[in-house]
């Protein structure tokens, strides 16, 4: 969509759209590193003879550190908020992934990926805090655009690995394909983006640290009980999203007897619906309220998740992907903004939970669904477990309350 058309459809962001889009681009450049790692592991395993356990060990180094360290670094950002945390995080994340192609020892790779994970943890709380500030009175749209950058990173990471490391045959010519040394592309992209952001956020730093903008302003207060209820909504939503997207291609293959490429096509289609729903949900939240969007989405998911495993035709299941994407992706920015408002003294910590820990903890439901599918011999039957999880999220959404005014 052309930029002018986008601004016309969402005029509320016209004043700060350059800052929001730049932060979103930074989010993309940070998150593409974590999503590149699964695509990179087969090349590392083939080159160094790593077994599955070692590959899992390396994946754990990045994802677990990035998720679990974020709340602590969020608290640090609340105390000593500095704009340069944003480019520093991008640079560390890029270097952590980029160095793996030049290392031959799994322990050195582990250390490199830990550094990359810390970089991702440094980036997210401060970047989300800045996105909140520069969004002005339209935080729903602003945070949704910021989070869409993360969705873009999810799509771009494997593509860069395919081009830079694996290569794409075009007739008798192979485009890209520099082997493991192709991971230098991540270092190059990280240096470029970090340089741009370091130059730009310096100009925002003073505004972001004024008493009105700082998360720890004098009149701010924390509502931990409300944040706990919101965390219940967020954890169930992440559990549903990660589990459904993980098994969607396998579902198309196992239940509808489709090809692997068709299953992956459905996943791409669902992801596209998700990006559109994320943006639309942010605009809806600014107009009708964050709690209302979360509740609508929570209750919309109930009948769809209950019906989906009963559908026997792929075309009808494909149609259901659109409303399900709305139910799962539309409330995300609302949850991030509400979390920042509930913990208005510690927006960095709130962002660390909503963007880090919730993703990891929610993702733990995917193995449970897989275990049930193996035990019961049916992925369609196991999919029914998503409905009670959605009920828990809907109940939590009913108890969300308005943030306390500062």
Where are these regions (language model features)?
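Extracytoplasmic gate region of multi-pass secondary transporters
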Residues: 37-38, 225-275
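Conserved MFS/SLC helix-loop-helix module at the cytosolic interface between two early adjacent transmembrane helices
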Residues: 68-106
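Helix-loop-helix hairpin linking two adjacent transmembrane segments in secondary transporters
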Residues: 145-203
